[in-house]
Swiss-Prot record:
Active site residues per record: E138
Gene from which this protein is expressed: dcd
Pathway note: Pyrimidine metabolism; dUMP biosynthesis; dUMP from dCTP (dUTP route): step 1/2
Pfam families with a match to the protein in the record: DCD (PF22769)
SUPFAM superfamilies (UniProt xref): dUTPase-like
Subunit and partners: Homotrimer.
Protein name: dCTP deaminase
UniProt entry keywords in alphabetical sequence: Hydrolase, Nucleotide metabolism, Nucleotide-binding
Protein source organism: Pseudoalteromonas translucida (strain TAC 125)
Family membership: Belongs to the dCTP deaminase family.
Length: 194
């Protein structure tokens, strides 16, 4: 069952859900809590590789990922990140989110941004029970104009759904959890899938 705004506030107040810094009352409405854009980004370099073999040898995959991903870009206050049409970039939320083992989170982009062509998460919008960290966003500009993205702008909204019971294997206890406690725009760790 999705939590209402009343229950989101209740769960935040009693610490069952933690969002740091805590959202103001104005940031919680209906069934969501607003999240803002952080100041860390990562882009894809122009490259000449014909393809990236996602199931190939681990060392080759790591080498390919290193050649196509930029170092992390950290914006100073007042700076903007420009996402051009057809570009994919990674970013993080300003807020750190921590979920218990019996709640799953769902991140949705804002309709107002989607109407300008901005996809906030390409496919990964589930936030697993037991998650703790900033959320990495997979931005894609499907519009016709470059978009200026600034830290602290409202970027998405998160809803929360209670499970029938706590997970036996929440994210924070999994040995194979690749993005545990992330606080930066972490690139794909697909080579760790083995």
């Amino acid at each position: 069952m999705r939590l209402s705004d009343t229950h989101i506030k209740e769960y935040l107040n009693d610490g069952r859900i933690v969002i740091e810094p805590a959202p103001t009352d104005e940031m919680i409405s209906g069934v969501t809590a607003d999240l803002r854009l952080g100041n860390k980004f990562r882009t894809f370099h122009a490259h000449t590789a014909a393809y990236v073999d996602l199931s190939g040898p681990k060392d080759q995959l790591n080498k390919a990922m290193e050649s196509i991903m930029s170092d992390e870009i950290v914006l100073d206050e007042g700076e903007a990140f420009f996402l051009h049409p057809g570009e994919l970039a990674l970013a993080i939320t300003y807020e750190k989110v921590t979920l218990p083992a019996d709640i799953v989170g769902w991140l949705d982009g804002r309709s107002s941004l989607a109407r300008l062509g901005l996809m906030v998460h390409v496919t990964a919008h589930r936030i697993d029970p037991g998650w703790s960290g900033n959320i990495v966003l997979e931005f894609y500009n499907s519009g016709k104009l470059p978009l200026a993205l600034r830290p602290m702008m409202k970027i998405g909204a998160m809803s929360f759904e209670t499970l029938t019971g706590p997970c036996a294997n929440p994210y924070n206890t999994r040995k194979d959890a690749k993005y545990k406690d992330q606080n930066s725009a972490v690139a794909s760790r697909i080579s760790d899938d083995r």
